Amino acid sequence: MKQILSGMVFLCILLCCVSCTEYTPKPRGYFRIEPPQARYQVLPLDSLPYSFNVSQLAIVELPEIGSPEGWINLSYPSLGVKIYCSYLPVTRSTLQIAENESRSLVSRQAKQAKAIKEQAYSNPDERVYGSLFLLDGESASPVQFMLTDSTSNFFRGALYYDCVPNADSLAPVTDYLRKDIIELIQSFSWKK
């Protein structure tokens, strides 16, 4: 009797294991990303023609030798992100060219983005004027900005991820860095 009962239990277990032909895939999950509280310090480079507050989480990188003067990268290794910043000395005639090129770079990202929101910025006391571009959707560069004094200086920045962008999973990082970029813009000043 025990042998029959043991045989039936073994047969039931065997049937349960091999009878299922439909597999249920597990949904993809993403790591929870919680950026730390933002703390800022003044950009620690006196040789640049501008100054702004930068997150203490960011590492300021100077580009390779031979890169134009005033270019820097703000790297966030713990978040896998860089903000590429470029500076151009301009004249009134080349300022329009720099602004158009900056808008063109934003437009190229619009092919992947659902929408572009532009926010104008003006600080007459520091002679800083510009625009912040927020790109919604699957864009490799969801936040870009440009700043100028409207006479001789032009500064541009673009946020890029070190991975294939997925707007939903990267939303906490994008929001955190958008706030960092807004702090950068609001604290920006020209040294000349």
Regions found by a protein language model. Give the residues of each.
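Bacterial N-terminal signal peptides that target proteins for export
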Residues: 1-9
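Post-signal peptide N-terminal segment of mature Sec-exported envelope proteins
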Residues: 28-49
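Secretory pathway targeting signatures of secreted, lumenal, and periplasmic proteins
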Residues: 48-103
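Second-shell loop/turn segments in exported
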Residues: 83-92, 143-145, 167-175
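Signature of long, low-cysteine stretches enriched in small and polar/charged residues
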Residues: 100-156
